[in-house]
């Protein structure tokens, strides 16, 4: 027998596609509503189904078609899904429009890329709150709770059946819902836990206790009764137990709380039980302004990273109440924890994998943007003592290139790089000397040769002095000890690495987030390990590559740009004060807390050569910060600053 929703969906579909009895149709979806359409519209030319996880299988008597089969068939595609998730599915298959394939909603609305926008702002659920749930609990004598995705949840987006030990590993309680459970108990309500699950009540109790839920509530589970919530059988058992234990009056005052609108909603109501539906963390993500992250789901690491995010950010089913579905970080610590840390954390795991494969004996982290990765590395080293020792050292393009100058060829190479500013600033920033000339640095051949002829001797003399001091500093740090060394840099063209190699007369293996505009005078493309590849003006295909300057401003330490070591072995920095560091430190706190939390769960320190790294999930979380209605306010955006004194740029906002 069809439920109200199924009847409505089938009727709506039939009204708008009844004239398409000849045209091939494909339904995207394999759920109850699709089944209702197939049952009620057998006269239509429905050739098959679509579902990202079931390609090639037969569902509801129809084959789930591949993209190749769809392109050959050229049907109309109708998305059979709630309005709140239609955009996710459409974005997943929008490329098919290039093949002349049109995509529709069940009401006949043709979907198109230009017309898409986030349209869940008026979702009734955004007005639901824990206060409303408390009120509903107050009005009933008996409260039953669903277990999975209501009281406890897994830190995974999708999963097959897990082993019992893995189940424990990935489980986390939903704190607000445990508060609601305890609230009901304090109010003297009779409590039952009702679950469609393959675990016995004894096993479920063990999982609940693992999550800190120690009270011995009565559990009614499908595998012990051969009926389910889905078929209504468990609710009949619940009512029977309530009547026997508490009487008929209590039987008529049951509230069931759960997340599944069919099993916990419609089926409970059809049994005469009042309901209060909450959203699972996954449903919250699907309905929220972050839904686009689900358009291209990845593999295991995507699953784990995005799963951890939703189990944290959407742990509270009322997290978006009053926000119209828009996800926002309330402060800089939250910004660091939820949106920045996942990308850095995944990179650091990748880095460890690489240095273990490459048998690196000493890992170098260059200032300033090596500071936070260094702190994270040290935390990871506590977890894996086989990692090589790490050194954080002061360097910059200015300091290392000047110290590495030995002849006119070195000088000429450094003049090729673009500089915006005066002649005086050019010679100060590039070579560490004072020039007398006024005027703008034009970098013409005539101007360059004339000025270099004039200042070559002074440049070489200063370079020798700075080289001696800087080499003393590097020796004191233990950097030129002839170990097999790796070097972290964030996004770069290899300038620091190349000149450091010249100074210590030793090759160093570079590990970056991404390289920049390779090949260049220093390195060919591909010789530096970088999971985000080589960023060029035409290769901005990840969120990191588009917004790396913001990440760069986050990673840095408290000091201004390092200039040199003076003759008294003192570190010299660019003038001024790094006023924004205290704000960046708040982001650091959130990131480091995330790392500590993940290290409690993860065991992915591996030297496996073909480990399947997947940065798409963390990259998507990072990219959300830059959405139109984004995760942070304009006031917080103002805290992100960078400078590029080496190329003549003063402080600027990096957002």
Predicted regions and their residues:
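Short amphipathic alpha-helix with an adjacent loop that forms part of the alpha/beta core around
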Residues: 65-74, 130-136, 236-242
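Substrate-recognition "cap/lid" segment bordering the active-site pocket of phosphatases
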Residues: 56-61, 192-194, 198-252
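Hydrophobic, well-ordered beta-alpha structural blocks that scaffold small-molecule cofactor pockets
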Residues: 1-117, 463-466, 470, 500
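Structural motif
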Residues: 28-32, 52-53, 79-84, 147, ...
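Short, acidic loop-to-helix structural element flanking the phosphoryl-transfer center
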Residues: 164-193
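Active-site neighborhood of HAD-like aspartate-dependent phosphohydrolases
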Residues: 134-166
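Long, low-complexity, Lys/Arg-enriched
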Residues: 239, 249, 254-257, 265-266, ...
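Active-site regions of enzymes building and remodeling cell-envelope glycoconjugates
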Residues: 44-47, 59-70, 94-103, 163-165, ...
């Amino acid at each position: 027998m069809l439920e109200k929703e199924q009847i409505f969906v089938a009727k709506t579909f039939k009204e708008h596609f009844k004239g398409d009895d000849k045209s091939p149709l494909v339904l995207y979806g394999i759920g109850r509503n699709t089944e209702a359409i197939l049952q009620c519209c057998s006269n239509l030319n429905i050739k098959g189904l679509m579902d990202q996880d079931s390609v090639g299988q037969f569902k509801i008597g129809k084959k789930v078609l591949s993209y190749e089969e769809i392109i050959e068939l050229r049907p109309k595609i109708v998305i059979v899904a709630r309005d709140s998730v239609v955009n996710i599915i459409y974005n997943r298959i929008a490329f098919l429009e290039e093949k002349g394939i049109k995509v529709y909603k069940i009401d006949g609305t043709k979907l198109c890329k230009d017309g898409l926008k986030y349209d869940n702002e008026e979702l009734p659920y955004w007005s639901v709150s824990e206060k409303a749930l408390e009120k509903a609990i107050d009005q009933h004598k008996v409260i039953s709770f669903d277990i999975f995705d209501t009281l406890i949840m897994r830190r995974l987006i999708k999963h097959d059946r897990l082993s019992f030990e893995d189940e424990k590993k990935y489980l986390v309680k939903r704190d607000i819902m445990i508060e609601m459970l305890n609230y009901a108990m304090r109010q003297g309500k009779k409590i039952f836990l009702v679950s469609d699950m393959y675990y016995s009540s004894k096993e479920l109790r063990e999982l609940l206790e693992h999550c800190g839920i120690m009270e011995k509530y009565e559990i009614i589970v499908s595998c012990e009764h051969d009926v389910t919530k889905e078929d209504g059988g468990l609710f009949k058992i619940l009512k029977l137990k309530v009547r026997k234990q508490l009487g008929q009056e209590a039987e008529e005052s049951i509230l069931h709380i759960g997340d599944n609108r069919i099993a916990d909603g419609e089926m409970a109501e059809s049994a005469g039980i009042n309901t209060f539906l909450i959203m699972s963390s996954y449903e919250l993500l699907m309905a929220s302004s972050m839904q686009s992250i689900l358009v291209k789901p990845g593999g295991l690491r995507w699953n784990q990273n995005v799963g951890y995010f939703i189990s944290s950010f959407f742990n509270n089913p009322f997290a978006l109440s009053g926000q119209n579905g828009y996800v926002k970080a309330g402060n800089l610590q939250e910004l660091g924890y939820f949106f920045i840390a996942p990308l850095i954390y995944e990179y650091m795991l990748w880095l460890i994998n690489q240095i273990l494969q490459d048998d690196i004996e000493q890992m170098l982290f260059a200032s300033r943007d090596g500071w936070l990765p260094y702190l994270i590395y040290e935390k990871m080293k506590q977890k894996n003592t086989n990692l090589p020792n790490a050194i954080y050292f002061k360097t910059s393009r200015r300091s290392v290139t000047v110290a590495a100058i030995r002849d006119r060829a070195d000088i000429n190479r450094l003049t090729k790089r673009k500089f915006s500013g005066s002649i005086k600033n050019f010679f100060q920033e590039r070579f560490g000397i004072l020039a007398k000339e006024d005027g703008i640095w034009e970098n013409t051949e005539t101007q360059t040769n004339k000025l270099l002829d004039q200042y070559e001797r002074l440049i070489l003399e200063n370079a020798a002095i700075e080289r001696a001091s800087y080499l003393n500093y590097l020796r004191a740090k233990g950097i030129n000890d002839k170990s097999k060394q790796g070097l972290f840099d964030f996004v770069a063209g290899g300038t620091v690495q190349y000149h450091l190699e010249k100074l210590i007369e030793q090759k160093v293996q570079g590990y970056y987030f991404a390289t920049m505009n390779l090949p260049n005078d220093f390195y060919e493309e591909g010789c530096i390990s970088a999971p985000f590849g080589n960023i060029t003006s035409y290769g901005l295909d990840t969120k990191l590559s588009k917004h790396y300057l913001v990440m760069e401003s986050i990673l840095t330490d408290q000091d201004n740009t390092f200039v040199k070591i003076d003759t008294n072995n003192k570190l010299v920095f660019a003038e001024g004060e790094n006023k924004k560091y205290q704000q960046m430190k708040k982001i650091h706190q959130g990131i480091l807390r995330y790392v500590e939390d993940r290290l409690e769960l993860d065991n992915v320190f591996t030297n496996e050569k073909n480990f399947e790294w997947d940065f798409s999930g963390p990259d998507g979380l990072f990219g959300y910060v830059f959405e139109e209605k984004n995760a942070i306010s304009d006031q917080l955006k103002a805290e992100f600053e960078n400078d590029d004194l080496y190329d003549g740029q003063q402080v600027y906002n990096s957002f």
